[in-house]
Amino acid sequence: MKTATPAILLGLMLATPACANPAPPPLEGPRLVLTGVGRFAVLADLSTVSREGDMTRMRSLQVTEEDFTVGGQTYWGGWSWWTFDCRAKTADRLDFASVREGGAEGPATPDAAPPYPAAPGGDAAELLAIACDPTSAGEADADNLADAVRVGRAALRLAD
């Protein structure tokens, strides 16, 4: 037993530097840009844009008007992941995850509908434009969910 203890301690000491590496820096926070206002305010999250060839993936936030309730629960809106074909100008909404008042998310519900042409002036076309050319978005309107909800709701009030 006495010879095993030094061997274990030596093993722990040799392993410690590998385990002691600092954690990787946190991922970039959201950078939300208002893309349109209709029944809902829609914001694109520039921090989620990833492109491979003509295909781009991005997350968006749909913000509801104040006091939007379903089944007695108040909602801020919901998140969706999208893929866009920048050359074909098609959009594919992959899911929807509701956001309850206070910021609790989910669960995500998959959207099995096939990709469709992004009609000019519609939410999908506005998101596609930003996803395919993120530099056209300019500065972010919000860098967190609560601020995005405030921005979206202010835009909804102005649109009325």
Which functions belong to the PLM regions below?
Residues M1-A4:
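Positively charged n-region of N-terminal signal peptides that target proteins for export
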Residues C19-D160:
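N-terminal secretory-pathway/extracellular module detecting exported/lumenal segments
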Residues A7-T16:
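Bacterial N-terminal signal peptides
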